[in-house]
Amino acid sequence: MKYHQKDIVEVNFLFPDGTFKPHPAIIVSNDQLQVDEDGMFYLVLITSNDWLNPQYSYPLSDEMVVGFSFSKPSLVKCQIITGNIERDVVRRLGTIKARYFNEIVDKIVDSIF
């Protein structure tokens, strides 16, 4: 398995207008899911767009991440989750620290359920 939970990866996200745009994302599903589901994992979108549905956003800063720095202020959009497989990943960017990852998961649960 090449990618793991907490990894920040770049993928092409499909938007409602049918276009694709590369974005960083955090792998939120556990590694066992990839094994059980033939390599599938779930990602949550990272963006610098802070105007759309801010109530579902979790702000990120460089100190929350290992191995990567954001070029702009960035947020996790906790309501935007996709299922992907390894071939969808353009590249691995870094890893989110465990403490912040757990806060993001809590925000996802609050945002969706």
Tell me the role of every PLM-derived stretch:
Residues L14-G18:
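Short, charged beta-turn/beta-strand-edge "cap" motif at the junction between a beta-strand
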Residues T19-P22, I27-S61:
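Compact nucleic-acid interaction/catalytic patches
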